[in-house]
Amino acid sequence: MKTSLRYILLSLCLFISCLIYGQGTESYVHGIVTDAKSGEPLMSVSCRTYDKNGKLLTFGISDVDGKYMLRLSANCSYAEFKSIGYKGHRISVASLHDNSDVTLERDAVALQEVTVNIKPIEVHKDTINYNIAAFKDVNDKKLVDVLKKLPGIEVDEAGRVTYKGNSINSFNIEGQSLLGNRYNQATNSLPIDAVAQVQVMEHDQPIRALRGKVLSDKATLNIKLKSDYKAKMFGELSAGGGYGDEALWNVDGTAVRIARKNQLLATLQTNNTGNNLNEYAKEHIDVTDIDGYEPIPNNKLTTERRTFLPIDEKRFTFNKSISAGLNHSHLVGKYGNFRSNIVFYGNRINDSDSLVNKYGGSSPVMLHEMDQSTFKDWVLAPIFHYEHNAPHVFLIEELTTSFGKQTNNGVINSNYVGIDSKTNARSITVQNKLQMTLTLGKQILQVNSFVRYYCNQEKLFSDDISDNPIYNLDERLLSKRLVARNSVSTIFNVWGNELRLKYALEYRNNGLRIQQDRYDKYFYVKNSFSPEYTIKYSRGFVYVALPLNALSSRMQWLPHSKNNRFYLTPSLRWSHHFNSQWRSMLSAGVTDDIAGEDPFSSFYFSNYRTKVSGLDNLGRNLSKSLSASLNYTNIISLFSWNMMVTSSWQKRDFYNSYTYDNQWSKIDPIWENVRSNRLLALTSVEKTWSKIRLFTKATVNFNHSEQPFIQNTVEYKVKSNILSTSLSLSWTKLSWLQIYNDATFNLSWQNNEQFKSSNSLRSYYNTFRLQVHPVKKLNFGISANNNIIETEPSKYHSLTFVDASCSYIISKRIELTGKVTNLFNQTKYIEGYYSGINYFYYERPLRGIEGLFSISVNF
């Protein structure tokens, strides 16, 4: 095995070396394109190279100063320069090497016949400018509506933006990061009429002190506003009312002011129309930023069951919600910036559902639960951020706090036993981040500090109102977590490449108190020393890291629980650009983390019937992963293709045993090595035909996992598979008619080795939307959403939602809108799904037919 591994590593090194050496067959040429008569530089000139057969090899576009850069491959025959209003100019490669400056002559005939159209995309070196007017149609209202159409850019349901499959460095408005990682406030609130361009700066190094010294493979998004919207207040206020099962309201307000030194974005939303607003308080976390990423733990006591459904959340959420955000940024001196981001949201949700649990195995158990509850929560989350970004000094100081409360009061009918259940949670989080970078000649010094304190008090009360009560509980938990993660690193230039030496110290002090019993605390200290080497070449880079870790832990309640261990967590990342269109990424690594919940000495009830026993030590999760991605983006033809494959193999030293009977559910840890694996494959294709205004996107996802578990003392191994395909189309060529369609097909199946059984379920979702403009200011819209869900093999449940809308633009600033949703008055959602050897049948009521009338005012 070791010999095979050596051969694999040797082959990989030889392949990379050959690839790097092979770059010598290509060269670059720089020059300036000017007007032959006036000598003025020409911008946006199309510069392309071809082989002898006329096949396009590379392309570029001249910048505002007429400068261009072209890569000349070995089989390049000639280059061609074209611009509207000018005669095309073809030049051989040999001539281009002798004189790289190019002049274009005006074409008098072309000037008479030319029709001025907005170019969808302009390229200036590593900056790609998407002109919004070329992608926007009359139905787009907010920035997010157009972002989803831009080639290479993806926006998920939570508003997180990725570019070519990678998270972005920063989301800026006119060069400033007003919102930090809460930028979905801008994507969902910024009026699209105010936006001129979306700039994507590829390979952007946002830290000035590291530019030209440390490579960045991520992009920065910058929103450019129209000149009429700069340095003045603008925004939108809409208010609406209507009726369904109760009186309805919806208020949405946005105020924006973007000036050179100051930026302001204020939002206010409130509704009872099903729009849950809690996403605005969440940050989009980059999990590749290990030093600055620490997930917030979930509540241990909860009565919630099914929170995600594959239909629009507005269909089943009976809410009263409010959200307010105040974001301000101010430049301090030449290189400083101070911003404050304050978000508040509150929710009240009336919920009811029914769940049939069929726990399989050697002793099957049937549990039928019906729940009616009122869930309330609120969160206040301010952030104060100072940044100094000078050529030799970079500093970030960020203070984040969060205060929240959640309550859930309900009545549960469990196998015909009535139970009053209440949960209550109060949490506080205080977090501080410090980042500093200094350049001392050729040497770079970096310091990072992350400190977070988290405290959560939880209560669970259940009152069994039957004749023979067994579910009377009064559970109280107090969780506290303190984590401090500090690191110092220095960067040297070794053999023309970057060598980073990094030392990190992580300290954790976590504790849990159950009832008024002992406060169970555990501590751990991890020291890490990591040499990291980056080999850069003209087409990409290879990154290798070999961290050595020393972990020491101790359980306070166990006198001889001290544990020390040393381990390596190597990683490899290879990014390669075959040309300006093709890009690949390969990564592999080993992680060795703590697994499971915090250890504690006793047990608690997480709900009225589930008993959770604690771990008496820290669990360990050893994971090996391999990931590969390939991306093709052609900004001339507006075509992009992505493919990603990720595989992981995990080994844990414990896993949970689940026990179900008619009265209780129990979760007990078992100290035994267990292995699992997962495979994820994803591919997507996007194509925009700008002349006919047709946008298409197709995706295919496949997820496979193998997971062993123990249920009712019997060990099982289940193989789960999910295949999902989707196709989106939009056609907006005609000014009076637009057509949209989104279709999704899901297939899930599971194989159980113990029972030699296999289960499969299918689902299909399709949304068709039609917008008609009989006159310029009048718009009619209708949408039909059809859902076909297989609840059991060969048994299907179908839902069809039909919505209609009408809007009339009174003036440039005022618009009236009327909407009717769920015209067929669908009242119940039904779903069946498998989890391991268990089957669940779920029902939930839906919002009925509703009408809403609103008025919107732009200012």
Model-derived features: where do they sit?
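Outer-membrane beta-barrel translocator domains and adjoining extracellular loop/strand segments
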Residues: 211-213, 277-283, 350-366, 399, ...
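Face-selective signature of the C-terminal outer-membrane beta-barrel domain
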Residues: 329-347, 374-412, 418-558, 567-570, ...
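Short Pro-Gly-centered beta-turn/loop motif in secreted/extracellular proteins
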Residues: 42-43, 69-77
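Short, acidic Ser/Thr/Gly-rich low-complexity loop/linker segments typical of extracellular
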Residues: 53-67
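Conserved C-terminal beta-signal and adjacent last beta-strands/turns
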Residues: 724-747, 755-859
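Membrane-proximal, glycine/serine-rich, low-complexity loop/turn segments characteristic
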Residues: 23-26, 36, 65-69, 80, ...
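Short, ordered, surface-exposed loop/turn motifs in non-cytosolic proteins
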Residues: 37-51
